[in-house]
């Protein structure tokens, strides 16, 4: 067969070409998924477990009959690698691709739809051919706020994850700007990583990892070392960090349902103090974790004795008030309002709860609501000078806000009026022009009539 004949054969029956020349990309090397690269991608990275990938594809049966195409829908197909969202062949084949690559995949039934098929388009025990283009891929957004992106290098064992308070043993390597600043084995309690110079993003990620999992974590400043940076490691304020973490082992902390009321109250006293230490150190996210434990343990606790109920209510009130203060510092004002609402549900005349809710609403530009809360503070404590000053601030801000709105609306109405006037002027000019043309036609018509010769048959 000549080169030209081979190229023609490849175009006419690409599935046969992959069957003859394709690379076996399966771990078992059983030729269940064969691949030929048709266009080389760029870069060195390939998708990892959990990555979200964006592809275009054409799918055909081995006889060349098309059964599906993302091009027909005019939008890429999106799925996550290694999550069982697609056939096995795709998890295997796409994970070998580079961004921009186009490849042909030939997939045996056991790596596709097997004996059941996918009727009516795909019969049982069908070998499938795909042309796949990898448009893009990105890591898993763990908290859905862009702050922690995980890329899993090695899948963990089992289905259990560390919880808050679990004792973990990990290996970590931290990088910033291409420089390794930390590399060690360390044991600590989840939620208390800061005590070991470990950023909060690692604590959060560990709660979603399995034993022996190895992953790469991209941490935004909020989940790294934040505005303070980490002089010990030479980390500047608001730096983005990359950690490679291996969870070697862990022992879960007791879940709420495993603790009796007495133990919950004892633990609440401990974590309240830990939260206060974090708060005073400016570590507000870590403080939120500690105060949040109190809420998770006691908010839905029933059947308490009078003494236990009083202690529980006291811990919950303090937790909600402290959480509100943390969220104010973190500029999460809606959450601060929510915590104040819960605190005031326990004590409707709580001065701190009213004041902090007023602060949060003021920062959300809810001036009237904020003013109402500060006025309630004065009803509780007429000597609260800060609340009195805040009322003045609310009035001033509301006035400024109203004046700004008036200016905006005045400018809008002025523009509308100018536009209407311009349209009216254009209509008038158009009408005048039209009348002029009509008069001209009449004049010409009369002139023609006067020039008509008389006496013709």
From Swiss-Prot:
Subcellular location: Cytoplasm; Nucleus
Subunit description: Part of a heteromultimeric cytoplasmic complex with HSP90AA1, HSPA1A/HSPA1B and steroid receptors. Upon ligand binding dissociates from the complex and FKBP4 takes its place. Interacts with functionally mature heterooligomeric progesterone receptor complexes along with HSP90 and TEBP. Interacts with NR3C1. Interacts with Akt/AKT1 and PHLPP1; enhancing dephosphorylation and subsequent activation of Akt/AKT1. Interacts with IFI44L; this interaction modulates the kinase activity of IKBKB and IKBKE. Interacts with IKBKB and IKBKE.
Ranges in a coiled coil: none
GO CC list: cytoplasm; nucleus
Originating species: Saguinus oedipus (Cotton-top tamarin)
Location of Phosphoserine modifications: 445
Catalytic activity: [protein]-peptidylproline (omega=180) = [protein]-peptidylproline (omega=0)
Official protein name in the record: Peptidyl-prolyl cis-trans isomerase FKBP5
Post-translational modification: Acetylation impairs ability to promote interaction between Akt/AKT1 and PHLPP1. Deacetylation by SIRT7 promotes interaction between Akt/AKT1 and PHLPP1, leading to suppress Akt/AKT1 activation. Ubiquitinated, leading to degradation in a proteasome-dependent manner. Deubiquitinated by USP49, leading to stabilization.
Enzyme class, first EC level, given as a word: isomerase
Region Disordered: start-end pairs: 1-28, 424-457
EC number: 5.2.1.8
Modified sites of kind N-acetylmethionine: 1
The protein's role, per its UniProt record: Immunophilin protein with PPIase and co-chaperone activities. Component of unligated steroid receptors heterocomplexes through interaction with heat-shock protein 90 (HSP90). Plays a role in the intracellular trafficking of heterooligomeric forms of steroid hormone receptors maintaining the complex into the cytoplasm when unliganded. Acts as a regulator of Akt/AKT1 activity by promoting the interaction between Akt/AKT1 and PHLPP1, thereby enhancing dephosphorylation and subsequent activation of Akt/AKT1.
GO biological process: one example: chaperone-mediated protein folding
Activity regulation (UniProt): Inhibited by both FK506 and rapamycin.
GO molecular function: peptidyl-prolyl cis-trans isomerase activity
Domain of life: Eukaryota
């Amino acid at each position: 067969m000549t080169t030209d004949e081979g190229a023609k054969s490849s175009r006419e029956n690409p599935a046969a070409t992959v069957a003859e020349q394709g690379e076996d990309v399966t771990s078992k090397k059983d030729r269940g998924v064969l691949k030929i690269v048709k266009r080389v991608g760029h870069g060195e990275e390939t998708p990892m477990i959990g990555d979200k990938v964006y592809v275009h594809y054409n799918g055909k049966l081995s006889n060349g009959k098309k059964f599906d195409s993302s091009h027909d829908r005019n939008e890429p197909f999106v799925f996550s690698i290694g999550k069982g969202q697609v056939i096995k062949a795709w998890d295997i084949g796409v994970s070998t691709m580079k961004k921009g690559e186009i490849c042909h995949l030939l997939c045996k039934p056991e790596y596709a739809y097997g004996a059941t098929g996918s009727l009516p388009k795909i019969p049982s025990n069908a070998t499938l051919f795909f042309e796949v283009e990898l448009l893009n891929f990105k890591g898993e957004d763990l908290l859905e706020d862009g702050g922690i992106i995980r890329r899993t290098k090695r899948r963990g064992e089992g289905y259990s994850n560390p919880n808050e308070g679990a004792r973990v043993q990990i290996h970590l390597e931290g990088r910033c700007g291409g420089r390794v600043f930390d590399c060690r084995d360390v044991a600590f309690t989840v939620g208390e990583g800061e005590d070991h110079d470990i950023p909060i993003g690692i604590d959060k990620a560990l709660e979603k990892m399995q034993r022996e999992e190895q992953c790469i974590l991209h941490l935004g400043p909020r989940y790294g070392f934040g505005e303070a940076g980490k002089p010990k490691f030479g980390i500047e304020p608001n730096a983005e960090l990359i950690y490679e973490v291996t969870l070697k082992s862990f022992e879960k902390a007791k879940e709420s349902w495993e603790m009796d009321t007495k133990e919950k109250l004892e633990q609440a006293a401990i974590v309240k103090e830990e939260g206060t230490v974090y708060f005073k150190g400016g570590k507000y996210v870590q403080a939120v974790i500690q105060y949040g434990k109190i809420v998770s343990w006691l908010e839905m606790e029933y059947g308490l004795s009078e003494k236990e109920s009083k202690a529980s209510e006291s811990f919950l009130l303090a937790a909600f008030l402290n959480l509100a203060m943390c969220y104010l510092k973190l500029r999460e004002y809606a959450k601060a309002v929510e915590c104040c609402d819960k605190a005031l549900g326990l004590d409707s005349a709580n001065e701190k709860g009213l004041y902090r809710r007023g602060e949060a609403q003021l920062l959300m530009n809810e001036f009237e609501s904020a003013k109402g809360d500060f006025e309630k503070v004065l009803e509780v404590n007429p000597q609260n000078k800060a609340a009195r000053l805040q009322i003045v601030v609310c009035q001033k801000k509301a006035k400024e806000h109203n004046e700004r709105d008036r200016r905006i609306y005045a400018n809008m109405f002025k523009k509308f009026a100018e536009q209407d006037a311009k349209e009216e002027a254009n209509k008038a000019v158009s009408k005048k022009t039209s009348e002029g043309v009509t008069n001209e036609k009449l004049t010409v018509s009369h002139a023609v009539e006067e020039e008509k010769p008389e006496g013709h048959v």
